[in-house]
Curated annotation (Swiss-Prot):
A cellular component annotation (GO) from this entry: plastid
Subcellular location: Cytoplasm
Organism of derivation: Arabidopsis thaliana
The family this protein is said to belong to: Belongs to the universal ribosomal protein uS9 family.
Assigned keywords, A-Z: Cytoplasm, Ribonucleoprotein, Ribosomal protein
Top-level taxon in the UniProt lineage: Eukaryota
Primary residence: cytoplasm
BP term (GO), one: translation
Molecular-function annotations in GO: mRNA binding; structural constituent of ribosome
Protein name: Small ribosomal subunit protein uS9x
PROSITE patterns reported in the protein's UniProt record: RIBOSOMAL_S9
Length: 146
C-alpha cells in the first residue's frame, strides 16, 4: 500500500467561560467554516465582526494559504464568539510556527497581542458559586434589627 503524505495541519482550541471552540487549520485556499457553514453567515450579525478581528488585523493574505474548520459548543452567543476568535488566532500562530517560519509567527503574535491579549491567552474568570444566606455568590438577604 502506498502511504499518503501527512497533511500540514494543526488543531487549537479557544475557551471563554463554558464555551469551547476547536479549530483545525490546514493548507488550503482560505476557507473558514464554522460548524460546517461559511463564517460569513454567522448569526448574530453584530458579533460577526468580533470573529473577523484576527482576519482584519493580520490581512487576508495570511489566511489565503490555509483552510480552517471550527467546531464550537457550550456557553452563550458572546462566549462562543470570544472562544472562536481565540481559537482562530491560536491556530494561525501554531500553523505558522510549525509549517512556515518563526519570524512571521513572531510578527503575527506581536500584532495580535498588541491589539488584544485575549486573542491568544484565555480569560481565567469563572462564575462564582452561590452560597447560603443570600440570593447569589456575594449578596445577602436583607437583615432586620427590629
Amino acid at each position: 500500500m502506498a502511504t499518503q503524505p501527512a497533511t500540514e495541519s494543526v488543531q487549537c482550541f479557544g475557551r471563554k467561560k463554558t464555551a469551547v471552540a476547536v479549530t483545525h487549520c490546514k493548507r488550503g485556499s482560505g476557507l473558514i467554516k464554522l460548524n460546517g457553514c461559511p463564517i460569513e453567515l454567522f448569526q448574530p450579525e453584530i458579533l460577526r465582526f468580533k470573529i473577523f478581528e484576527p482576519v482584519l488585523l493580520l490581512g487576508k493574505h495570511r489566511f489565503a494559504g490555509v483552510n480552517m474548520r471550527i467546531r464550537v459548543n457550550g456557553g452563550g452567543h458572546t462566549s462562543q464568539v470570544y472562544a472562536i476568535r481565540q481559537s482562530i488566532a491560536k491556530a494561525l500562530v501554531a500553523y505558522y510556527q510549525k509549517y512556515v517560519d518563526e519570524q512571521s509567527k513572531k510578527e503575527i503574535k506581536d500584532i495580535l497581542v498588541r491589539y488584544d491579549r485575549t486573542l491568544l491567552v484565555a480569560d481565567p474568570r469563572r462564575c462564582e458559586p452561590k452560597k447560603f444566606g443570600g440570593r447569589g455568590a456575594r449578596s445577602r438577604y436583607q437583615k432586620s434589627y427590629r
